[in-house]
C-alpha cells in the first residue's frame, strides 16, 4: 500500500493546518486598549496597513531601550488548545496577536514584505538582515522565496515587539534576546476528544486529523528550519494543557515572563 506523501508546497501544508486554526480560534475580538487584535476576519491588506500605522505611531519619538523579551512565540500540538492560550495571553498582556494563517498570508506576498521593511530604519533593518543571514548559515538553510519572505515578515514583527506569534516557525526566526518560546502540548486522548467535541466528528476522524496535521507541521519545520518540532531544546517553556487547562497555562507563561507590566513593553 502506497503511503501518503507529504506535500512540499507550503500552501498545501497550510491548507491541512487550517482545520486546527479553526479548532480553537473562532472569530474572537480581543480588546487591547482600544486596538483591534490581528484577526482573521479582516483582509491581509487591511491587517498590514493597520499594523504599519500602529508601528509608525508608537515609534514616533520613542527612546532607545535595552533589548528585552518583547515577543512570545507559541508552537502547539494540534488539538491542544494552543490558539486559545495565545489569545488569552494577548488579552491579558495587551499584545498584538498574529495567528499562523495571518503570518502565512503575509509571507506569501512580496508587497507585504516590502511594506513592513518601510517601518524599520536602516540600522534596525541591517541588524535584522544580519540575524537572518546568521540563522541561514547556522541551520544550513536553503531559503526559497516563501522562507525569505517569512523570515523577513516575522523578523520585522519581532523587531517591533509587543506581540504573540503562533506557529510558522516563529520561535526559530525571532532573535533569542527578544522572545520567549512556548510549546503547548497535550495527551493524544485529550486532543482527540477536543477535536471530536468541537467539530462533532467521530473519534476515529478526529484522531486522523490530529495525526495528519501533526505530521504536516513536523514536515514544515523540518523542511524550512532543519529542526525537530518536538525537540524540547527548541523551547523555553513547555506546557501540558491536558493537565493545566487553558487559563492556568496562560498564567504560567506570564509567571515565567515575570511581572507582566515589566515585560513585552516598548518604552514610550
How would you describe each model-predicted region?
Residues 7-36:
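Short, Lys/Arg-enriched N-terminal segments with co-localized hydrophobic residues
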Residues 29, 33-69:
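Extreme N-terminal, non-catalytic leader segments
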Residues 54, 127-129, 203-247:
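Small-molecule kinase domains that catalyze NTP-dependent phosphoryl transfer to phosphate-bearing small molecules
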Residues 67-72, 161:
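Pre-Walker A (Motif I) flank of P-loop NTPase domains
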Residues 107-162:
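ATP-dependent small-molecule kinase phosphotransfer cores
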Residues 177-197, 203-211:
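Conserved phosphate-donor/acceptor-positioning beta-strand/loop module used by diverse small-molecule
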Amino acid at each position: 500500500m502506497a503511503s501518503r506523501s507529504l506535500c512540499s508546497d507550503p500552501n498545501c501544508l497550510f491548507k491541512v493546518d487550517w482545520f486546527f486554526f479553526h479548532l480553537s480560534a473562532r472569530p474572537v475580538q480581543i480588546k487591547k486598549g482600544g486596538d483591534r487584535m490581528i484577526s482573521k476576519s479582516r483582509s491581509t491588506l487591511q491587517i498590514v496597513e493597520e499594523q504599519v500605522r500602529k508601528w509608525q505611531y508608537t515609534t514616533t519619538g520613542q527612546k532607545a531601550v535595552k533589548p528585552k523579551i518583547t515577543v512570545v512565540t507559541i508552537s502547539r500540538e494540534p488539538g491542544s488548545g494552543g490558539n486559545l492560550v495565545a489569545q488569552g495571553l494577548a488579552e491579558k498582556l495587551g499584545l498584538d496577536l498574529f495567528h499562523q494563517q495571518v503570518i502565512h498570508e503575509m509571507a506569501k506576498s512580496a508587497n507585504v514584505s516590502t511594506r513592513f521593511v518601510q517601518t524599520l530604519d536602516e540600522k534596525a533593518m541591517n541588524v535584522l538582515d544580519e540575524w537572518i543571514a546568521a540563522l541561514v548559515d547556522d541551520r544550513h538553510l536553503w531559503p526559497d522565496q516563501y522562507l525569505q519572505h517569512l523570515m523577513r515578515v516575522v523578523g520585522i514583527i519581532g523587531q517591533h515587539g509587543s506581540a504573540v506569534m503562533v506557529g510558522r516557525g516563529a520561535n526559530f526566526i525571532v532573535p533569542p534576546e527578544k522572545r520567549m518560546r512556548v510549546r503547548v502540548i497535550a495527551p493524544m486522548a485529550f486532543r482527540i476528544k477536543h477535536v471530536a467535541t468541537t467539530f462533532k466528528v467521530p473519534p476515529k476522524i478526529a484522531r486522523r486529523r490530529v495525526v495528519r496535521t501533526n505530521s504536516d507541521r513536523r514536515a514544515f519545520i523540518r523542511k524550512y528550519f532543519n529542526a525537530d518540532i518536538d525537540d524540547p531544546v527548541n523551547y523555553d517553556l513547555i506546557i501540558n494543557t491536558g493537565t493545566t487547562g487553558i487559563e492556568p497555562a496562560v498564567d504560567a507563561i506570564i509567571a515565567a515572563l515575570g511581572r507582566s507590566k515589566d515585560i513585552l513593553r516598548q518604552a514610550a
